[in-house]
From Swiss-Prot:
Transmembrane segments: 5-25, 47-67, 76-96, 104-124, 135-155, 174-194
Keyword entries, A-Z: Cell membrane, Membrane, Transmembrane, Transmembrane helix
Keyword Ribosomal protein carried by entry: no
Protein name according to UniProt: UPF0056 membrane protein PH0214
GO CC, any one term: plasma membrane
Main location: membrane
Record bears the keyword Plastid: no
Length: 202
């Protein structure tokens, strides 16, 4: 079982992809106090784990049988959210617009916990791992991947402390461009999947 757990954790870590979470932490560092961002990281990863746990247990029923939602539709919606955040950062707004509208807990839920942590790829992995290896392997593997993601986000947060305001401002805009690209790719992938399904169904 150990081999299955480790391979499941690796797959889930790849699907979660900590790199874009690290980029977002860099954005948050400009607009929020470091203690608030630390709190956000913990809450976001906890919420992300709960969501993935839910989908690992009953993902197929929730998505397809109850709400009739395809994963490609989630990709498009999640990509739009990320694209909007990246655009604000690129224009120099950072997370200010979101900060005015939502408290730190709400921001931890959206967009950090979902779609960044519990995104379409991670949700698909949770459902697949449960089907292939059972619920225990899926849950433990997901927990390990979430713990690694949270640790990397914390490390990135402290590394950003030594960067000057000017360098941080330039970095924020570059990061914003990458986040826009991630969001655009999610939308393209999702839209492509929707079109392909429509063609197959025709």
């Amino acid at each position: 079982m150990l081999k299955e757990i480790l391979s499941s954790a690796l797959l889930m870590l790849i699907m979660i992809d900590p790199s874009d979470k690290i980029l977002l932490v860099s954005l948050l560092r400009e607009d929020f106090h470091i203690e608030d961002v630390k709190s956000l990281i913990i809450r976001a990863n906890l919420i992300g784990f709960i969501l993935l746990l839910l989908f690992a247990v009953a993902g197929k029923i929730i998505l397809q049988d109850i709400f009739h939602i395809e994963l490609d539709a989630l990709r498009v919606a999640g990509g739009f959210v990320l694209f909007k955040i990246g655009l604000e950062a690129l224009e120099g707004g950072g997370m200010v617009t979101i900060k005015r509208e939502k408290n730190i807990l709400a921001l931890a839920a959206v967009p950090v916990a979902t779609p960044l942590i519990a995104g379409p790829a991670a949700i698909t992995a949770a459902i697949t791992l449960t089907a292939e290896h059972g619920i225990i392997v899926s849950i433990v593997g997901t927990l390990i991947a979430i713990a690694i993601t949270a640790a990397l986000m914390m490390i990135a947060l402290y590394l950003m402390r030594g960067i000057s305001k000017t360098a941080l401002s330039v970095t924020i805009r570059i990061i914003g461009l990458f986040i826009m690209a991630i969001g655009a790719q999610m939308m393209i992938t999702g839209a492509g999947g929707i079109v392909l399904n429509l063609i197959k169904g025709a």
